[in-house]
Amino acid sequence: MPRKGPAPKRPVIIDPVYGSPLVTSLINKVLLNGKRSTAERIVYGAMEGLREKTGNDPVITLKRALENIKPTLEVKSRRVGGATYQVPIEVKPGRANTLALRWLVGYSRARREKTMTERLLNELLDASNGLGAAVKKREDTHKMAESNKAFAHYRW
């Protein structure tokens, strides 16, 4: 165990185009092999598509999509006397954001559209309307936590 304590949180750089740290985080999640300009082109293309399709600020639509994806509960494995229990725990806000972005990008990559920009755009639109694979993942996570509620007293 390290004795220095937790590593300090680094500030998220605010995105120059939309002025939102959420957009920066999304770009960082889309980023592959250090190709930041490609990731920015994908995200900015999806944001412009959101502006065209919804007719309002894409950052608002992104926030609404993330609110629909963010989990409030998850399960963690806890070993007690030879048995492993899935213990439901509440998700901290920072982790909820990270999970939402991770699921959004992961399920965008798994979609069938031709370009990543289209995939991300359509997953964002679906999520903002309460549909899509990322929202289903959240529902499944909540369902797992609900079905394992009996083990909540093993929380640490």
Swiss-Prot record:
Q: Which Gene3D superfamilies match?
A: Ribosomal protein S7 domain (1.10.455.10)
Can you name a GO cellular component term? ribosome
> Keyword Ribosomal protein on this protein?
yes
UniProt keywords (A-Z) are:
Ribonucleoprotein, Ribosomal protein, RNA-binding, rRNA-binding, tRNA-binding
Q: One GO molecular-function annotation for this sequence? A: mRNA binding
What SUPFAM superfamilies does this protein map onto? Ribosomal protein S7 (SSF47973)
Matches recorded under InterPro entries = Ribosomal_uS7, Ribosomal_uS7_bac/org-type, Ribosomal_uS7_CS, Ribosomal_uS7_dom, Ribosomal_uS7_dom_sf
The answer, when asked if S-adenosyl-L-methionine is one of the entry's keywords, is no
Q: Which CDD domains match?
A: uS7_Bacteria
Which family does the record claim for this protein? Belongs to the universal ribosomal protein uS7 family.
The subunit structure is: Part of the 30S ribosomal subunit. Contacts proteins S9 and S11.
**Name listed for the protein in its UniProt record:** Small ribosomal subunit protein uS7
Natural source organism: Streptomyces coelicolor (strain ATCC BAA-471 / A3(2) / M145)
Q: What's the gene?
A: rspG
